[in-house]
Amino acid sequence: MMKRRTAIKLLGSALPALYLSKKSFGAENWGKAPFKPDWVSLESYEVPDWFRNAKFGIWAHWGPQCQPERGDWYARGMYEEGSDQYQYHVKKYGHPSVFGFKDVIHEWKADKWDPEKLMDLYKSTGAQYFMALANHHDNLDLYKSSHQQWNSTNVGPKKDIVGGWEKAAKKRGLKFGVSVHAAHAWTWYETAQRSDKNGPYKGVPYDGKITKADGQGKWWEGYDPQELYAQNHALSRNSDNGGSIHGQWHWDVNSGVSIPTASYCENFKDRTVELIDNYNPDMVYFDDTALPLWPISNVGLEIASHYYNKSKKAHKDKVEVVVTGKI
């Protein structure tokens, strides 16, 4: 059996969490649980045979970012004045002070999506597992979420995208995974706090800081854009430099990154645990270093521990699930 990668262990043990989670899961008792939310406990994890033996899987990195057909970082780039995505957005949709990414989501209907037909194709290619995008950095949950109002069953297609993928994959005997990217929305959307520095809209703020009160009479009335954009905070250092986010990706407090609040971290945890509990994925990929929001929060440790404990209980004392990530 393969052990959890040594690199992850070393990264994880580097710093203590800035925010320790103050809430525990309703049925969780860490004192008696096989896996506890700390790196030492997680070292006992062993990769299940199915993942070691699976050589080919397919990942559908598909969500509202595909609607404009201009790249998966569209919701960030459209707020960068002068960029290709900004210019495309202004020409196709209008100025981002008026038509933001929330409105792109509204246009995404997924009306030609046929998960059953697609899964037949994926199965025919020899795929042994399938990965669905559960959320991207744009922060829209593609599943029915009670902790994120901005989800695909409420807005956009008004469909349970993850649920459709899950049903189709498991029906055909494929292992089912989800990828989770939303932890970075806090800094990723910082471009939406800006305004143009030139032209007729000079100084007019983009829609990144609008609130629920601004939605009266609009299609999104009753929804709080801050649940999507998460921009009611100070900008990270050098945020006007589009490349600075890469040096701040690891939440290093010395990098000048704006540190997410404890409530933001807890909400991410609640959303992810609900995803795990309701859709029972065989694998979760986090687009993060080590685990989400580490080392500023231990919510990633709690998510992983909960996931492993849940699997161990369901599979006669064996852990049959996988957590993986960017690094």
Residue ranges and their predicted role:
Residues 21-23:
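C-terminal segment of classical bacterial N-terminal signal peptides
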Residues 12-15, 25-327:
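Mature catalytic domains of secreted/periplasmic carbohydrate-active enzymes
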Residues 1-15:
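N-terminal secretory signal peptides and thylakoid transit peptides that target proteins
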